[in-house]
Amino acid sequence: ENGDLIAAVGSTQDFTGFNRALDAKRQVGSLLKPIIYLNAIESGRYTWATPIEDTAVNIPIDGDKSWTPKNYSGGEHGVVPMQQALANSYNLSTVRLANEFGLSTFSNKLKQFGVTSDIPAYPSIYLGAVNMSPMEVLSIYGNFATGGFKYPPRTIRTVVDAKGRLLERYGLNVQQTIDPAAAYILNYGLQQVMRSGTGRSAYSSLPQSLNLAGKSGTTNDTRDSWFAGYSGNHVAVVWLGLDDNKITGLTGSSGALPVWTNVMKQLRQEPVNLRQTDNVQWQWIDSA
Protein backbone atom coordinates (compact mmCIF):
# COMPACT_ATOMS: atom_id res chain seq x y z
CA GLU A 1 0.00 0.00 0.00
CA ASN A 2 2.76 2.48 0.86
CA GLY A 3 6.12 0.70 0.96
CA ASP A 4 6.33 0.75 4.77
CA LEU A 5 8.55 -2.05 6.07
CA ILE A 6 6.85 -3.95 8.90
CA ALA A 7 9.68 -6.33 9.76
CA ALA A 8 13.03 -7.65 8.54
CA VAL A 9 14.23 -10.73 10.38
CA GLY A 10 17.49 -12.40 9.47
CA SER A 11 19.82 -12.60 12.46
CA THR A 12 20.39 -15.52 14.79
CA GLN A 13 21.30 -13.22 17.68
CA ASP A 14 20.66 -9.60 18.63
CA PHE A 15 23.18 -6.95 17.58
CA THR A 16 25.34 -9.26 15.47
CA GLY A 17 25.72 -6.59 12.79
CA PHE A 18 24.68 -8.93 9.98
CA ASN A 19 21.04 -9.27 9.00
CA ARG A 20 20.49 -11.85 6.28
CA ALA A 21 17.29 -10.15 5.19
CA LEU A 22 19.30 -7.07 4.26
CA ASP A 23 22.88 -8.21 3.78
CA ALA A 24 22.96 -11.84 2.61
CA LYS A 25 23.01 -12.23 -1.16
CA ARG A 26 22.14 -15.62 -2.59
CA GLN A 27 21.01 -17.00 -5.92
CA VAL A 28 17.27 -16.54 -6.26
CA GLY A 29 16.25 -19.36 -8.59
CA SER A 30 12.85 -19.11 -10.25
CA LEU A 31 11.81 -15.92 -8.45
CA LEU A 32 12.83 -13.91 -11.53
CA LYS A 33 10.70 -15.87 -14.00
CA PRO A 34 7.72 -13.46 -13.75
CA ILE A 35 9.88 -10.78 -15.37
CA ILE A 36 10.33 -12.98 -18.45
CA TYR A 37 6.58 -13.49 -18.74
CA LEU A 38 6.02 -9.78 -18.18
CA ASN A 39 8.29 -9.01 -21.14
CA ALA A 40 6.23 -11.40 -23.26
CA ILE A 41 2.96 -9.80 -22.16
CA GLU A 42 4.25 -6.29 -22.81
CA SER A 43 5.27 -7.26 -26.34
CA GLY A 44 1.61 -7.75 -27.24
CA ARG A 45 2.40 -11.06 -28.94
CA TYR A 46 1.60 -13.37 -26.03
CA THR A 47 -1.34 -14.16 -23.78
CA TRP A 48 -1.56 -16.73 -20.99
CA ALA A 49 -3.14 -19.11 -23.51
CA THR A 50 -0.31 -18.82 -26.05
CA PRO A 51 1.29 -22.25 -26.64
CA ILE A 52 5.05 -22.35 -26.00
CA GLU A 53 7.51 -25.21 -26.24
CA ASP A 54 8.88 -26.84 -23.13
CA THR A 55 11.53 -28.82 -24.96
CA ALA A 56 15.31 -29.05 -24.88
CA VAL A 57 17.15 -25.82 -25.59
CA ASN A 58 20.84 -25.09 -26.14
CA ILE A 59 22.15 -21.51 -25.97
CA PRO A 60 25.66 -20.64 -27.21
CA ILE A 61 27.74 -18.54 -24.82
CA ASP A 62 31.48 -17.79 -24.86
CA GLY A 63 33.44 -19.25 -27.77
CA ASP A 64 32.43 -22.83 -28.41
CA LYS A 65 30.68 -23.20 -25.06
CA SER A 66 26.93 -23.49 -24.61
CA TRP A 67 24.34 -23.56 -21.84
CA THR A 68 21.83 -26.40 -21.70
CA PRO A 69 19.28 -25.89 -18.91
CA LYS A 70 17.09 -28.69 -17.56
CA ASN A 71 13.69 -28.83 -15.93
CA TYR A 72 13.63 -29.58 -12.20
CA SER A 73 12.01 -32.94 -13.00
CA GLY A 74 14.59 -33.66 -15.68
CA GLY A 75 11.91 -34.22 -18.34
CA GLU A 76 10.11 -32.17 -20.97
CA HIS A 77 6.44 -31.20 -21.23
CA GLY A 78 6.05 -30.51 -24.94
CA VAL A 79 3.81 -27.65 -26.04
CA VAL A 80 2.04 -26.02 -23.09
CA PRO A 81 0.01 -22.84 -22.49
CA MET A 82 2.19 -20.02 -21.22
CA GLN A 83 0.18 -19.89 -18.00
CA GLN A 84 0.99 -23.55 -17.24
CA ALA A 85 4.70 -22.92 -17.81
CA LEU A 86 4.78 -20.19 -15.16
CA ALA A 87 2.44 -21.89 -12.68
CA ASN A 88 4.55 -25.06 -12.68
CA SER A 89 7.87 -23.23 -13.03
CA TYR A 90 9.04 -25.00 -16.19
CA ASN A 91 12.61 -24.03 -17.02
CA LEU A 92 12.87 -24.99 -20.69
CA SER A 93 9.86 -23.03 -21.92
CA THR A 94 10.86 -20.07 -19.76
CA VAL A 95 14.36 -19.95 -21.22
CA ARG A 96 13.02 -20.24 -24.76
CA LEU A 97 10.73 -17.30 -24.08
CA ALA A 98 13.45 -15.24 -22.41
CA ASN A 99 15.86 -15.82 -25.26
CA GLU A 100 13.40 -14.20 -27.64
CA PHE A 101 13.70 -10.87 -25.80
CA GLY A 102 17.37 -11.02 -24.85
CA LEU A 103 19.58 -10.41 -21.84
CA SER A 104 19.53 -6.61 -21.98
CA THR A 105 15.73 -6.46 -21.80
CA PHE A 106 15.78 -8.77 -18.79
CA SER A 107 18.62 -6.95 -17.00
CA ASN A 108 17.08 -3.52 -17.59
CA LYS A 109 13.84 -4.68 -15.99
CA LEU A 110 15.70 -5.84 -12.88
CA LYS A 111 17.36 -2.44 -12.51
CA GLN A 112 14.09 -0.65 -13.16
CA PHE A 113 12.44 -2.63 -10.37
CA GLY A 114 15.09 -1.66 -7.81
CA VAL A 115 17.85 -4.28 -8.05
CA THR A 116 21.27 -2.79 -7.27
CA SER A 117 23.34 -6.00 -7.21
CA ASP A 118 25.63 -6.82 -10.12
CA ILE A 119 23.76 -8.65 -12.88
CA PRO A 120 25.89 -11.15 -14.85
CA ALA A 121 25.62 -11.03 -18.65
CA TYR A 122 24.93 -14.75 -18.97
CA PRO A 123 21.65 -16.45 -19.93
CA SER A 124 21.68 -18.47 -16.69
CA ILE A 125 20.31 -15.34 -14.98
CA TYR A 126 16.97 -16.21 -16.59
CA LEU A 127 16.73 -19.03 -14.05
CA GLY A 128 17.98 -16.94 -11.16
CA ALA A 129 21.76 -17.43 -11.29
CA VAL A 130 22.25 -13.98 -9.78
CA ASN A 131 22.87 -13.09 -6.13
CA MET A 132 20.32 -10.86 -4.41
CA SER A 133 19.25 -10.05 -0.89
CA PRO A 134 15.70 -10.77 0.29
CA MET A 135 15.21 -6.99 0.43
CA GLU A 136 15.99 -6.68 -3.28
CA VAL A 137 13.53 -9.47 -4.06
CA LEU A 138 10.96 -7.59 -1.97
CA SER A 139 11.54 -4.51 -4.12
CA ILE A 140 10.88 -6.52 -7.30
CA TYR A 141 7.65 -8.07 -6.06
CA GLY A 142 6.46 -4.74 -4.73
CA ASN A 143 6.16 -3.63 -8.35
CA PHE A 144 3.84 -6.54 -9.07
CA ALA A 145 1.74 -6.13 -5.93
CA THR A 146 0.99 -2.45 -6.50
CA GLY A 147 -0.13 -2.90 -10.09
CA GLY A 148 3.06 -1.54 -11.60
CA PHE A 149 4.43 1.05 -9.18
CA LYS A 150 7.73 1.09 -7.32
CA TYR A 151 7.57 2.08 -3.66
CA PRO A 152 11.08 1.88 -2.18
CA PRO A 153 10.87 0.15 1.24
CA ARG A 154 10.42 2.83 3.90
CA THR A 155 11.42 2.32 7.54
CA ILE A 156 10.93 5.87 8.87
CA ARG A 157 7.91 8.11 8.25
CA THR A 158 8.76 11.08 10.45
CA VAL A 159 11.34 12.31 12.95
CA VAL A 160 10.21 14.38 15.94
CA ASP A 161 11.98 15.93 18.91
CA ALA A 162 11.37 15.22 22.61
CA LYS A 163 8.34 17.53 22.57
CA GLY A 164 6.79 15.88 19.56
CA ARG A 165 7.65 18.66 17.12
CA LEU A 166 8.20 17.54 13.56
CA LEU A 167 11.83 17.66 12.47
CA GLU A 168 11.69 15.66 9.25
CA ARG A 169 9.06 13.91 7.17
CA TYR A 170 9.88 11.14 4.72
CA GLY A 171 7.28 11.06 1.99
CA LEU A 172 6.57 8.46 -0.65
CA ASN A 173 8.76 8.30 -3.72
CA VAL A 174 6.57 6.51 -6.25
CA GLN A 175 7.48 5.59 -9.82
CA GLN A 176 5.37 3.77 -12.39
CA THR A 177 7.34 0.81 -13.75
CA ILE A 178 4.75 -1.38 -15.49
CA ASP A 179 1.82 -0.51 -17.72
CA PRO A 180 -1.36 -1.13 -15.67
CA ALA A 181 -2.78 -3.56 -18.24
CA ALA A 182 0.40 -5.65 -18.28
CA ALA A 183 0.55 -5.58 -14.47
CA TYR A 184 -3.04 -6.82 -14.26
CA ILE A 185 -2.35 -9.70 -16.65
CA LEU A 186 0.88 -10.68 -14.88
CA ASN A 187 -0.93 -10.61 -11.56
CA TYR A 188 -3.45 -13.14 -12.90
CA GLY A 189 -0.62 -15.48 -13.84
CA LEU A 190 0.93 -15.23 -10.38
CA GLN A 191 -2.46 -15.97 -8.84
CA GLN A 192 -2.56 -19.20 -10.84
CA VAL A 193 0.78 -20.15 -9.29
CA MET A 194 -1.08 -20.11 -5.97
CA ARG A 195 -4.20 -21.87 -7.21
CA SER A 196 -2.77 -24.68 -9.31
CA GLY A 197 1.02 -24.40 -9.29
CA THR A 198 3.95 -24.47 -6.91
CA GLY A 199 2.28 -22.19 -4.35
CA ARG A 200 -1.01 -24.05 -4.01
CA SER A 201 -0.30 -25.52 -0.56
CA ALA A 202 -0.70 -22.02 0.94
CA TYR A 203 -4.45 -22.37 0.56
CA SER A 204 -4.49 -25.24 3.03
CA SER A 205 -4.07 -22.54 5.70
CA LEU A 206 -5.24 -19.32 4.04
CA PRO A 207 -8.65 -18.60 2.45
CA GLN A 208 -8.81 -18.71 -1.34
CA SER A 209 -10.85 -15.52 -1.26
CA LEU A 210 -7.58 -13.62 -0.68
CA ASN A 211 -6.61 -14.23 -4.33
CA LEU A 212 -2.96 -14.45 -3.32
CA ALA A 213 -0.16 -14.13 -5.87
CA GLY A 214 3.41 -15.38 -5.63
CA LYS A 215 6.29 -17.48 -6.89
CA SER A 216 8.60 -20.12 -5.45
CA GLY A 217 12.33 -20.32 -6.06
CA THR A 218 14.79 -23.20 -5.72
CA THR A 219 18.48 -23.12 -6.63
CA ASN A 220 20.78 -25.91 -7.84
CA ASP A 221 21.02 -28.91 -5.51
CA THR A 222 18.39 -27.31 -3.23
CA ARG A 223 20.88 -24.98 -1.56
CA ASP A 224 18.40 -22.10 -1.38
CA SER A 225 14.66 -22.17 -0.76
CA TRP A 226 12.67 -19.01 -1.59
CA PHE A 227 9.12 -17.79 -1.70
CA ALA A 228 7.90 -14.30 -2.60
CA GLY A 229 4.24 -13.34 -2.69
CA TYR A 230 1.58 -10.88 -1.72
CA SER A 231 -1.97 -10.26 -0.60
CA GLY A 232 -3.83 -7.02 -1.22
CA ASN A 233 -1.97 -5.21 1.56
CA HIS A 234 1.23 -7.16 2.35
CA VAL A 235 4.25 -8.33 0.38
CA ALA A 236 6.53 -10.89 2.02
CA VAL A 237 9.72 -12.71 1.02
CA VAL A 238 11.21 -15.76 2.74
CA TRP A 239 14.64 -17.30 2.16
CA LEU A 240 15.89 -20.48 3.82
CA GLY A 241 19.47 -21.67 3.48
CA LEU A 242 22.79 -22.26 5.20
CA ASP A 243 25.58 -19.71 5.51
CA ASP A 244 28.12 -22.27 4.26
CA ASN A 245 25.96 -22.86 1.15
CA LYS A 246 25.50 -26.55 1.87
CA ILE A 247 22.53 -28.49 0.55
CA THR A 248 19.30 -28.05 2.54
CA GLY A 249 17.13 -30.50 0.63
CA LEU A 250 14.36 -27.89 0.60
CA THR A 251 12.58 -26.57 -2.47
CA GLY A 252 10.81 -23.24 -2.45
CA SER A 253 7.50 -25.04 -2.00
CA SER A 254 8.62 -27.40 0.78
CA GLY A 255 10.71 -24.92 2.77
CA ALA A 256 10.10 -21.21 2.29
CA LEU A 257 6.41 -21.42 1.36
CA PRO A 258 5.22 -22.91 4.69
CA VAL A 259 7.13 -20.16 6.54
CA TRP A 260 5.66 -17.50 4.25
CA THR A 261 2.18 -18.89 4.80
CA ASN A 262 2.61 -18.86 8.58
CA VAL A 263 3.80 -15.24 8.52
CA MET A 264 0.86 -14.15 6.38
CA LYS A 265 -1.55 -15.92 8.76
CA GLN A 266 -0.40 -13.68 11.61
CA LEU A 267 -1.33 -10.48 9.77
CA ARG A 268 -4.68 -8.99 8.79
CA GLN A 269 -4.94 -9.68 5.08
CA GLU A 270 -6.97 -8.08 2.33
CA PRO A 271 -7.60 -9.79 -1.02
CA VAL A 272 -5.60 -8.95 -4.12
CA ASN A 273 -7.93 -6.85 -6.25
CA LEU A 274 -6.12 -5.06 -9.05
CA ARG A 275 -8.38 -3.06 -11.35
CA GLN A 276 -8.95 -4.51 -14.81
CA THR A 277 -8.10 -1.87 -17.40
CA ASP A 278 -10.39 -1.14 -20.35
CA ASN A 279 -7.94 -2.59 -22.87
CA VAL A 280 -7.85 -6.04 -21.23
CA GLN A 281 -10.39 -8.55 -22.53
CA TRP A 282 -11.20 -12.13 -21.54
CA GLN A 283 -11.88 -14.76 -24.19
CA TRP A 284 -12.84 -18.43 -24.02
CA ILE A 285 -10.16 -20.71 -25.46
CA ASP A 286 -10.74 -24.20 -26.87
CA SER A 287 -8.12 -26.31 -25.12
CA ALA A 288 -8.29 -28.88 -27.90
Language-model regions: role of each:
Residues 1, 5-8, 13-20, 32, ...:
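A penicillin-recognizing enzyme superfamily signal
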Residues 1-32, 43-50, 104-110, 122, ...:
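Periplasmic/cell-envelope proteins involved in peptidoglycan metabolism and beta-lactam response
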Residues 2, 46-106, 150, 161-192:
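Conserved catalytic neighborhood of penicillin-recognizing serine enzymes
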Residues 18-26, 68-73, 81, 92-98, ...:
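Second-shell loop/turn segments in exported
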Residues 35-42, 47-54, 278-286:
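Cysteine/selenocysteine-centered motifs that mediate thiol-based redox chemistry or coordinate metal-sulfur cofactors
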Residues 39, 43-44, 48, 59, ...:
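A generic secondary-structure signal for well-formed alpha-helical elements
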Residues 50, 55, 123-125, 154-157, ...:
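Extracytoplasmic/periplasmic beta-strand context in beta-sandwich domains
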Residues 64-71, 102-141, 148, 152-155:
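Mid-domain, small-residue-enriched loop/turn segments at the edges of structured enzyme/sensor domains
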